[in-house]
A protein has these predicted regions:
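Alpha-helix-loop-beta-strand connector modules within alpha/beta enzyme cores
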Residues: 1-17, 36-39, 43-66, 94-121, ...
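Glycine-rich loop at the start of a catalytic domain that most often binds anionic cofactors/ligands
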Residues: 1-5, 26-31
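Catalytic cores of alpha/beta
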Residues: 15-30, 65-79, 113-116, 120-122, ...
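Glycine-rich phosphate-binding active-site loops on the catalytic face of alpha/beta enzymes
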Residues: 36-44, 82-95, 131-164
Length: 168
């Protein structure tokens, strides 16, 4: 029921469930984001093929911390990559090694050299002042939670992020 309500109010948005493909498919989400310890992208696609109607759009994102993680995800048919963490964050418990700006530059360059055109979103400890340098690495976008949740005015902070991202 919650999935149906969300879909009624988010017809122009991607409704993504974190970590659980089965729940994402059952509640009518358009996407699932899989962490490194969740089921594989290929297993999620097998589930999706059984439950989606022909022509129905569904996205499967994968978490990555290295170029090799991206190679693996691309090989399994990932729709996009959540690459991180950018810096330390308390939002995630089992944190992979922090990449920093140089890590993003290196990995994005490796993706270009490999001919990958998969969307890459930076994640992990991102603040408003990080948007410009991160976007300049060639990533597609950012995923933010803590900076907005902990802001004095989360709505205004969201608008600030949107305005900054829209410059790219």
């Amino acid at each position: 029921e919650i999935g149906q309500l969300i879909n009624e109010h988010t017809n122009k948005c991607i409704y993504c469930i974190n970590d659980n493909a089965r729940i994402a498919l059952r509640c009518g989400a358009n996407a699932v984001h899989l962490g490194k310890e969740d089921i594989s992208v290929s297993a999620a696609w097998e589930m999706a093929k059984e439950q989606l109607f022909p022509g129905e759009t569904f996205y499967i994102g994968a978490t990555a911390n290295t170029f090799e993680d991206i190679e693996h995800a691309v090989g399994q048919g990932a729709s996009y990559i959540g690459l991180g963490p950018f810096r330390y964050t308390e939002t995630k418990k089992k944190l992979s090694p922090v990449l920093g700006l140089e890590g993003y530059r290196k990995i994005v360059q490796q993706c270009k050299e490999a001919g990958y055109k998969i969307p890459i979103f930076a994640i992990g400890g991102i603040c408003l002042e990080d948007v410009t340098p991160l976007m300049e690495t060639g990533i597609t976008g950012i995923a933010v939670s803590g900076a907005i949740i902990h802001a004095e005015d989360p709505v205004e902070e969201t608008h600030r992020f949107i305005n900054e991202i829209n410059k790219y």
